[in-house]
Amino acid sequence: MKTLNKITLDVTISIIDFLYRGRHFPRFWVLEEIARAPYFAFISVLHLRESLGLRGQVHTDLMKEHFAQTLNETEHLEEMEKRGGNKYWIDRFFARHLVLLYYWINVAYYLFDPIDAYDLSEKIEWHAADTYSKYLEEFPQDEKISAIMQDEIHHAQELSEAIRLIT
């Protein structure tokens, strides 16, 4: 599945790179819109498992962590909105349809293979950090983007820790 994760990510990145070449904030907005979906999906599945009596401290810890990650990604999304990232309806249309698909894929993926679901999300967080890093090479004075990049690195590390917790 890790190979499928890499292929999926590479294809998605290629499409987004093509559509958003030279448009930093719309690209960031789309990435942040998408970034929340796995955390919502993970929380949904963890809540379902908990409702079925399949809970434990690890479930509770993961739910808290994923909720915090969702809030943090929402703050990033709001920052990109302030910068005009969601200005055009076509960007909103694309992102919201992609996120709907991505959410349900993550629900199924996390339900049946949480380790690989976390692996895919970790790869996406590292990609987001890399995307922000490239922007910062051009605009090193942008402290807000620098802080967001650090958050993405932290999220990737948290996902790696989540994999460790459930194995």
Please give the residue ranges for each predicted region.
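Non-heme di-metal
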Residues: 1-167
